Regions:
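Intracellular juxtamembrane helix-capping segments at the cytosolic ends
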Residues: 139-153, 475-490
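Helix-to-loop junctions at the C-terminal end of transmembrane segments
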Residues: 76-93, 185, 400-420, 520-521
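Transmembrane alpha-helices of Major Facilitator/SLC transporters
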Residues: 72-79, 291-301, 386-410, 421, ...
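Intracellular loop-helix junctions on the cytosolic face of multi-pass helical membrane proteins
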Residues: 1-25, 116-128, 154-356, 543-576
Length: 576
């Protein structure tokens, strides 16, 4: 009951108290392992893999294209209805959550073993295919673990405690998959590092076999509000869902086919060269954003318009009678309904909101995949040095940035903090531009504050200062952005709306990585860092517009309250 008391009082334990609590309860102990199982593949596939490729002299344009596997995490909500509803043959006796977890964890173990048996210099297409399979398996595992956490929560293991323990396990995995992997790479080969990580992943299957599962009946009997009188007709919803689905399928096919062609060694029949990443991004990038963001918003707005005019709505309850119909309702709730509510509540202001969401973290997302190649290959730091600076020291700097963001939010408010976060996130890229250009400004800063007198050589101090600036800015901006997303999310659709909007954060940055990698290959790191800092001004502009929009909305709301109060006083006077 200690866990329940802590959750009720709001005193969620941390650090060693949290670990002690996790080891004292079956569900919390398994949640700790599941957090590790979720964090390890993400760290290895999205971050550490780029260190391996950079050291083995894979060009940055190729690394950028391969980084598109991260889109699997951004858009895992697309197949979450399938994972939630479909029973896996021959594994059903394990339960609806454990059966999916076993498949994902076996695939992830095979992924790391498969990568360890591949040479990306000679088998890039095969290497990329294995990484793609691993990313989809990892993203699917995240969906299942999130559902399991909610399903098994009870008084002895409240969801707040389970969530904290999940984050604890995730951070342990980030240290092992990041810092430990880099340290090991200085002593053994990269293939051996990934084989060892495959062994760690295989151990998580034991926790899955020991985990309790949840019954399906209660969810399957639940009648969706989408089937009640006054809702849009299922037939029309199916048409809208089909339109949105086709847009998503086209976007996924376009990105996937380009990845296959480039990483598989295909050449342009006219030029005789590999496909140009920059040309692809300029030609298809805007259309991909239109198909995955603008088209669903238009469909959602159309349904709002029809519902307001009582067109094509149910006149009586019409419960779903098949698994396919329930899955369609679930997909509609994940893809269209959250945007529909946002459009209805904000109106045309949704254009500003979506623009802000798409651009706010772009300065971090668009070049993050090249951080390890930059440190290890360009600047010639060792794996031990990068492990300490990025994965240990950098974590504390990020936590400091988050604390600063929280303090600013409490003192100066949401929108000023959001604006400052956008500015410092863009400006932090200029620190890396200086580092890539010889660190003249960084050296001056270090000497002014005598930072090179604390037992570190100036070369290491440069890296620590750059990572400090980037991580503090990123932590501040991240805290401000999470607070902003939470503020615009409807309580009615909190989970699905937040998941959808937060996933859009990664879209533009992920699509732009390949073009950024190609640009670095051609003109070097420093000009690209300056350009990404300039791109960050787009987010600054959207924050200013959103600040104006929210101020006007608050003014209108205040005026409405005054009019209502005046009307109430007049009514009281008439009664008297």
């Amino acid at each position: 009951m200690a866990a329940a008391d802590a959750a009720v009082s709001g005193d969620v334990p941390k650090g060693w108290r949290l670990l002690k609590l996790a080891l004292g309860n079956r569900k919390t102990l398994i949640m700790l392992v599941f957090g590790f199982a979720a964090g390890l593949p993400y760290t290895l596939l999205i971050g550490t893999l780029n260190a391996w490729l950079g050291e083995w002299e894979i060009d940055l344009a190729t690394i950028g294209v391969l980084s598109w596997i991260g889109l699997a995490y951004a858009f895992k909500f697309l197949w979450s209805p399938l994972v939630d509803r479909v029973r896996l043959p021959m594994l059903e006796r394990l339960g609806r959550r454990r059966s999916w977890l076993i498949v994902c964890q076996v695939l992830l173990t095979a992924t790391f073993i498969g990568l360890s048996l591949s040479d990306p210099r000679l088998q890039l297409g095969w290497f990329a295919l294995v990484a793609v399979i691993g990313a989809f398996a990892s993203a699917t595992q995240d969906v299942v673990i999130d559902a399991w956490r909610i399903d098994v929560a009870d008084e002895r293991a409240p969801v707040e405690i389970l969530s904290s323990i999940y984050q604890f396990g995730y951070r342990i995995a980030a240290l092992i998959g990041g810092a430990l992997a880099l340290v090991l790479s200085e002593r053994v080969s990269w293939p051996m590092v990934y084989a060892i990580m495959g062994g760690f992943m295989a151990l998580t299957v034991i926790a899955t076999l020991a985990a309790p599962d949840t019954p399906r009946d209660a969810i399957e009997r639940e009648q969706s509000a989408l089937r009640q009188a006054g809702a849009i007709e299922p037939r029309l919803r199916a048409i809208g869902l089909g339109i949105v689905g086709l847009g998503w399928l086209w976007a996924i096919w376009t990105v996937g086919s380009f990845m296959v062609n480039m990483l598989g060694g295909a050449v342009d029949p006219v030029t005789g060269k590999p496909p140009a990443v920059g040309d692809f991004t300029k030609l298809y990038g805007p259309w991909i954003v239109a198909a995955t963001v603008i088209l669903p918003a238009i469909v959602a707005a159309t349904f709002n318009w029809l519902k307001a005019r009582k067109g094509y709505i149910l006149t009586a309850d019409e419960p779903a009678t098949s698994g396919g119909a329930r899955a369609a309702d679930h997909a509609y709730s994940a893809l269209i309904l959250p945007l529909g509510e946002l459009v209805r509540r904000i109106g045309w202001g949704v254009i500003i909101v979506l623009g802000l969401i798409l651009s706010y973290r772009i300065t971090d997302n668009i070049w993050g995949s090249f951080a390890f190649p930059f440190y290890l290959t360009e600047l010639k730091y060792t794996g031990d040095e990068v492990a300490f600076a990025s994965k240990i020291f950098g974590v504390f700097m990020t936590m400091g940035g988050i604390a600063i963001g929280a303090a600013m939010f409490a003192t100066i408010g949401r929108m000023p903090t959001l604006l400052i976060g956008a500015i410092v996130a863009a400006a932090s890229n200029l620190i890396y531009a200086d580092l890539a250009s010889g660190a003249v400004a960084i050296d001056a800063f270090a000497r002014f504050f005598a930072l090179d007198t604390f037992g570190q050589d100036l070369r290491m101090v440069r890296l620590l200062i750059a990572i400090s600036g980037e991580n503090i800015a990123g932590g501040l901006a991240g805290a401000a952005f999470v607070a902003y997303l939470s503020s615009i999310t409807s309580r009615e659709f909190s989970a699905v709306q937040y998941a959808l909007l937060s996933s859009l954060t990664f879209l533009v940055g992920s699509l732009g990585r390949a073009a950024v990698g190609e640009a670095i290959d051609q003109i070097g790191y420093a000009p690209v860092f300056r350009f990404t800092a300039l791109i960050g001004l787009v987010a600054v502009g959207f924050v200013v517009l959103e600040w104006v929009r929210t101020a006007m909305a608050e003014r209108r709301a205040g005026g409405g309250e005054i009019l209502a109060a005046d009307a109430a006083r007049e009514a009281e006077g008439d009664t008297a």
